């Protein structure tokens, strides 16, 4: 596990929502894990899940007392990005503002580099 300054940001809006969800679950050990998988209409897609574990090699980013966890393989695609949260007409969701993405699908859930 490394806790260093990495060029990946965890927005205040995302941290606030994670904090609220953790409180609902009544499990302060939970962390938000962001990861990249193959798939989607553009080649790669983002995934978000809650995880109690931080694996060897994972990078952690802390904001407002909550932790974002990223595995080393996913981190290489997320450098310079911002993990954020929005609520709007399309619903509420976590998303990544990713400067490495050369194309994205219409909903923003998948991308290519």
From Swiss-Prot:
Alphabetical list of Pfam families matching this protein: Fe-S_biosyn
Cofactor names: iron-sulfur cluster
MF terms (GO), sorted A to Z: 2 iron, 2 sulfur cluster binding; 4 iron, 4 sulfur cluster binding; iron ion binding
Keyword Ubl conjugation included in the entry's annotation: no
InterPro entries: FeS_biogenesis, FeS_cluster_insertion, FeS_cluster_insertion_CS, FeS_cluster_insertion_RrpA, HesB-like_dom_sf
Keywords: Iron, Iron-sulfur, Metal-binding
SUPFAM superfamilies the UniProt entry points to: HesB-like domain
Cofactor annotation comment: Binds 1 iron-sulfur cluster per subunit.
PROSITE patterns (UniProt xref): HESB
One annotated GO biological process: iron-sulfur cluster assembly
Domain of life: Bacteria
Binding of iron-sulfur cluster, residues: 41, 105, 107
Gene Ontology cellular-component annotations: cytosol
UniProt keyword annotation of Membrane present: no
Gene3D superfamilies according to UniProt: HesB-like domain
Subunit structure: Homodimer.
Biological role stated in the UniProt entry: Required for insertion of 4Fe-4S clusters for at least IspG.
Record-stated family: Belongs to the HesB/IscA family.
NCBIfam families hit by this protein: iron-sulfur cluster assembly accessory protein, PRK13623.1
Protein's recorded name: Iron-sulfur cluster insertion protein ErpA
Biological source species: Vibrio campbellii (strain ATCC BAA-1116)
Gene, per the UniProt record: erpA
